[in-house]
C-alpha cells in the first residue's frame, strides 16, 4: 500500500478512482469492487474517503429513502458510517449490495451495545452526538421510553428530524440542538460535509459555533428523574462530556457506551473519569469504545 505524500498525489488517486467509476463502468457494484482494489494501492485521508463515499451513495441513491431491518432512513454517507457502528455484527449485513460493500470497509468495532451493556425496556437514554439518528431509532425500537438526542450541527439535526418522522418515533425522541461539554459554553466545531468532524482536532474546512451544556446542568435544569443509558460519540469531546456528567454518573449510574478513538489517551482518561464519578462501575474496553455498568 502506498501512503500519499502530497496533495497532488492524493488528487491523482481520487481522479483514478473516479475515472474507473464514471468512465469505465457506471455500475456502482463494479465501482465498489474497483474501489476496494484501489484502496490497497492508495492510502486515502479520512476526510477524502468520507467525501468520496458521500458522492457514491448520492449517485446511486439520490434523495431516496433506504429501508432495512424494517426501518427507513434518508440516504446519506453517514448512514454507512453509523450503520456499521450501530446495527451490524458479524452475523448480519442485510442491506442491498452497494451499501453492504461500503459497510464492509467501515465495520471496525461493532455496535454501541454489548450483551452486558444494552438498552432495556423503559430506559431513558441520552444519545450524545446523535448525528442522523440511527442509534436513537434503534433505542426506540428496543423499547426505550424516552431518548434525548443531542446534535448541535444544523444539517445533521435536520436529517435526524426526518429519520424520526420516517420511523414514527417523534413522540419518543426529543432533539436537543446542543453539544455536550464540561460546562455551558460556545465552542468551534470543525464540520465536514454538513456533519460534525471534530471539536478538538483541527481538520481544515469550515467551522460552526455550537452551544454546549453539561449533562449535569441539563439534567438539573430539565428535572430529569432518571438516566439509564448514555451513548457518546462527540468527536473528541467525550472526556469533556464526562467531566460535566460526574453527578449524573454518581446519582443514576447509567450504562455507558463511550467512543475512545478520537485522542490517543482516550481509553485511560475516559476510564479514569468514569471511575472518579462512580467507583462501582465495571469497565469493558473494545478497540474503539468503553462500555461500563454498575
Which stretches of residues belong to each language-model region?
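Phosphate/nucleotide-binding beta-alpha loop and adjacent structural elements of enzyme active sites
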Residues: 1-294
Amino acid at each position: 500500500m502506498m501512503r500519499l505524500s502530497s496533495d497532488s498525489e492524493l488528487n491523482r488517486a481520487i481522479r483514478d478512482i473516479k475515472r474507473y467509476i464514471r468512465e469505465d463502468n457506471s455500475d456502482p457494484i463494479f465501482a465498489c469492487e474497483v474501489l476496494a482494489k484501489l484502496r490497497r494501492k492508495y492510502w486515502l485521508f479520512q476526510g477524502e474517503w468520507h467525501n468520496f463515499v458521500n458522492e457514491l451513495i448520492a449517485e446511486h441513491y439520490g434523495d431516496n429513502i433506504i429501508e432495512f431491518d424494517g426501518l427507513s432512513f434518508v440516504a446519506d454517507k453517514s448512514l454507512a458510517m453509523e450503520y456499521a457502528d450501530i446495527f451490524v455484527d458479524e452475523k448480519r449485513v442485510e442491506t442491498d449490495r452497494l451499501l453492504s460493500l461500503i459497510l464492509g470497509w467501515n465495520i471496525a468495532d461493532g455496535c454501541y451495545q454489548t450483551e452486558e451493556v444494552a438498552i432495556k425496556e423503559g430506559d431513558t437514554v441520552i444519545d450524545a452526538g446523535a448525528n442522523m439518528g440511527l442509534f436513537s431509532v434503534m433505542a426506540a425500537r428496543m423499547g426505550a421510553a424516552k431518548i434525548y438526542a443531542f446534535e448541535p450541527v444544523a444539517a445533521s439535526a435536520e436529517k435526524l428530524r426526518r429519520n424520526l418522522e420516517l420511523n414514527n418515533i417523534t413522540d419518543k425522541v426529543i432533539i436537543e440542538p446542543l453539544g455536550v461539554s464540561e460546562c455551558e459554553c460556545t465552542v468551534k466545531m470543525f464540520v465536514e460535509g454538513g456533519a460534525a468532524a471534530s471539536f478538538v482536532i483541527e481538520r481544515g474546512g469550515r467551522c460552526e459555533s455550537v452551544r454546549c451544556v453539561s449533562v449535569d446542568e441539563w439534567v438539573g435544569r430539565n428535572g430529569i428523574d432518571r438516566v439509564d443509558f448514555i451513548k457518546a460519540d462527540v468527536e473528541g469531546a467525550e472526556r469533556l462530556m464526562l467531566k460535566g456528567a460526574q453527578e449524573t454518573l454518581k446519582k443514576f449510574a447509567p450504562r455507558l457506551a463511550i467512543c475512545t478513538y478520537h485522542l490517543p489517551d482516550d481509553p485511560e482518561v475516559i476510564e479514569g473519569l468514569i471511575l472518579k464519578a462512580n467507583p462501582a462501575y465495571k469497565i469493558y474496553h473494545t478497540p474503539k469504545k468503553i462500555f461500563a455498568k454498575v
